[in-house]
């Protein structure tokens, strides 16, 4: 399900599994000037992706991250837009398939009411987002996530939200993505999801590349879930150490025979990720990804297609999982 309606599996094409169109990171105050709030810039940057052959984007902007509490998103008649409607508008304008996520990000970004809600109540809210519409709109979510955790562990309230996400995933059948940075908490998240009965083949652990341990990546993949290297635009701007480390980790996954569990994306979440401001944008992978990865680690065109076409399709649809 995209923000403009259902599509078939063969319409997914080249897919970025973890991006953001509009994003409010004001709770991390040091990022205040850098969050994604400019519809004109969003259109320009997304059009670059479309023009480069990009077809689908999964926008994992969950509750707490949505740019809807500030009067910054408008339609052509200057009417204030809710986040989901603003994403729908840019999808219509560019022709990109945008699949919008739901749920809640991480504890720092939760609304106070979540502490008073039971697990099943939170789950039902996510189910409504998928089956009816997000935040009172008719724009339906087609994905659950990103569902986050702190840097080294899952807090008690984050576990409640994660269990709710698991129950919503089972009821709706859409794929689920977690947020796990610079630590091994992705395995703890998988433990919780699998305890609730979620098929790990419908789960992607985001930001896996930020924890540079092959053993961690291999364990995620061996359980059946997907490893997401989703700051790939950084290959354009990374220092030599980070550049070589990322390439080494990717090659280790492929050499271990785990390519069917590997996903790439850019996680555009700051204005400085835009091409306009020197970043890789949404189009680095579609314009330069294969060339860079072939030169550095010998990635073939067939392998690149597996990562950018086949793997996202299996995650999102469950077909051939």
What is the predicted function of each stretch?
Residues 89-93, 97-172, 226, 232-235:
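Active-site gating/metal-coordination segments in enzymes
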Residues 166, 170-252, 261-262:
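Catalytic pocket-lining loop regions of alpha/beta-barrel enzymes
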Residues 18, 57, 104, 169, ...:
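Divalent metal-coordination and catalytic microenvironments
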Residues 46-78, 95-108, 140-149, 175-176, ...:
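Divalent metal-dependent hydrolysis catalytic cores, especially in the metallo-beta-lactamase
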Residues 25-29, 69, 84, 185-192, ...:
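Histidine/acidic-residue-rich catalytic or RNA/ligand-binding cores of hydrolases
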């Amino acid at each position: 399900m995209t923000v403009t309606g259902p599509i078939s599996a063969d319409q997914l094409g080249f897919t970025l599994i973890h991006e953001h169109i509009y994003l409010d990171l004001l709770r991390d105050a040091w990022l205040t000037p850098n969050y994604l709030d400019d519809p004109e810039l969003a259109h320009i940057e997304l059009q670059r992706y479309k023009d480069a052959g990009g077809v689908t984007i999964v926008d994992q902007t969950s509750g707490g991250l949505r740019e809807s509490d500030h009067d910054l998103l408008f339609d052509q008649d200057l009417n204030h837009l809710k986040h989901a409607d603003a994403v729908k508008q840019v999808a219509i304008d560019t022709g990109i398939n945008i699949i919008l996520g739901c749920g809640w990000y991480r504890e720092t970004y939760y609304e106070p009411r979540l502490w008073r809600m039971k697990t099943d109540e939170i789950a039902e809210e996510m189910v409504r987002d998928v089956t009816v519409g997000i935040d009172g709109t008719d724009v339906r979510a087609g994905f659950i996530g990103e569902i986050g955790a702190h840097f080294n562990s899952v807090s008690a309230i984050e576990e409640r939200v994660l269990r709710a996400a698991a129950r919503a995933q089972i009821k709706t059948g859409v794929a689920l993505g977690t947020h796990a940075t610079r630590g091994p908490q992705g395995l703890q998240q998988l433990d919780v999801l699998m305890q609730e009965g979620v098929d790990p083949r419908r789960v992607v652990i985001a930001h896996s590349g930020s924890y540079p341990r092959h053993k961690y990546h291999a364990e995620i993949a061996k359980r059946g879930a997907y490893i997401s290297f989703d700051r790939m635009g950084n290959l354009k701007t990374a220092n030599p150490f980070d550049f070589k480390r990322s390439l080494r980790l990717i090659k280790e996954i492929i050499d271990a025979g785990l390519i069917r569990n590997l996903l790439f994306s850019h996680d555009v979440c700051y204005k400085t990720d835009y091409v306009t401001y020197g970043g890789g944008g949404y189009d680095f992978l579609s314009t330069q990804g294969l060339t860079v990865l072939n030169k550095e680690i010998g990635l073939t065109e067939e392998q690149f297609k597996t990562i950018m076409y086949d793997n996202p399709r299996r995650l999102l649809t469950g077909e051939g999982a």
